[in-house]
């Protein structure tokens, strides 16, 4: 996980607001002055890279929430498979909320964009959301289109993003108390069951496992969703294997 660079002064949210007021209506390059770290209630906001103009690739922004503030139980991220599953879910949660605010701040080019890495059906380790196993600190990276009118700074619209939209996304998706604890537990349990299967297969002389009842056909060639009314998979009896999973219990399929 990226650590705060030495020599960079931590500023307050009030200082950021004051800075935005000073550069409002100036030429777009003045946005470069916002690069730095700012302490908000419950997290640190870092403006890591500022785009050159409103039509360029969006600015890189990240938030760091301390493990103590985030409040996630250690058993949800103590091992690698648990941590990847939790990181994936938090990124999805943040992304869904960010979509509601995308382009609500107006302007030219990519003004008002708020986005994170898009997740497919796969649960993968991504640099977009990282949890530090020693202390539970959460780092989440996003892209934001800094608003402009033409190529003139529209700081009031960026204020909406940084002081209204982003804080709401952070508190709703990165604080354990605001999330469905049972859902998080089910997600981590599923990850542990999957990891158990992966470790058991070599012991059984197998390289793959498909559970009975799986719907393998996809909705279309460009979709990862299962086909509606698709025929559920059923293993031939001679290739059937039963595993005892830590959480789900017995599961049968083709090995």
Regions found by a protein language model. Give the residues of each.
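N-terminal pre-Walker A segment at the start of P-loop NTPase domains
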Residues: 219, 223-249
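N-terminal accessory targeting/assembly segments
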Residues: 1-218, 222-230
